[in-house]
Amino acid sequence: MTFIPDTAIFDAPCIFEDLEEVRKTVDDPEFFAQIQESYRDSGYELLGYSDQGFRVMSTNKEITSFEDFSGQKIRTMENSYHLEFWSALGANPTPMNFSEVYIGLQQNTIDAQENPYEVIVSNNLYEQQDYVVETNHLPHLISLVVSKDFYDELPEEDQEILIEAQEIAREYSREASDERISQRIETIEESGTQIITLDDETRQAMIDASAAIYEDIRESVDPGIYEAYMGDRD
């Protein structure tokens, strides 16, 4: 989100063990208060975060070690931190419009791509891939926002109602997302595409390879936001 520079913090890869840790971090009052101010500076009132789980990798090459990432031509978004991450893994990141990804996989223009399970299944990307690798490199967060001007004009009572409604919606959406991910995994497995869970050694190698990215993000975002989000993970 180039219009909210501090949201670059969400591009820090491989720092969470599970979704519970992600949600605990973004809901943490210290972190939330600081990132909320960044949204306000850009004209938004941040109410909370939902998510679609983690981003994972789909590929036609079996990944069983860190070295297996080497040389894979993977489609990414046009995001400098994403490009830096996959390059650090030894892959060949290739920015591409999402509308071209399915054909790119079909025609072997690219070897792999990365997205949350919901996107992989709803767009049938798994049909062109032999493996889905649970890299879980980034949480796929969804910002629940309204215009700051709109929010500020609301009576205090209505602001409280909006916040309460967001809390209910956030919890519901998280539960629905978890259930949906389980269904999407089942769909992928039934198709014959294999899901790979990485071992601890490979995960640690990915973290180690990300050290320079953590430093780049540290230099780009508010120090308080960085510390509250990263903790001692870097």
Placement of each model-derived feature along the sequence:
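N-terminal secretory/targeting leader peptides
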Residues: 1-21, 30-31, 35-234
